[in-house]
Amino acid sequence: MSPEPYLGEVARTPVRHHILSVLVENKAGVLARIAGLFARRGFNIYSLAVAPAESHARFSRVTIVVDAESAPLEQIVQQLDKLVNVVAIKDLAPRDAVERELLLATLPLDYKHRPAMIDTITLAGASIVDVGPTSVTVMLAGTPEACDELERALEVFTKVELHRTGRVALPRLG
């Protein structure tokens, strides 16, 4: 009997996060200073993503997601603002932001469970991006909740490997 595709609801546990979009000078050591600041204060970084900002090699945008209970927003912003290479800080409230993550998973090619696997992948809005002789790689670019749901749905299949990026976010336009 093949595993059934997971069609359940996303668990909506009220986890509160602060999403900070931090514009920094693109210089060596800046990320280490930011991470060090969080470590010294005992703030846990839930998610972290860094990339060059808006095609300017001089700046990078750091998206940091922290647990609201462990890290008071005002204190984080004040401490970040003291760092020399920090140019700007935006607090993106989850309701006012568009958030995305990337999930990549390698699954064994199991022809017996192939239909259920394809149904699960398709229903999640994911796609197969690579096929090898014994495994496939699945990708989903979606909300953190969609990535959580796909990760849970793939639990019925043996995973060779699973990776998720840090969250990225932009303010909503309207």
Regions found by a protein language model. Name each.
Residues M1-S60, V65-G174:
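Long, contiguous binding/interaction regions
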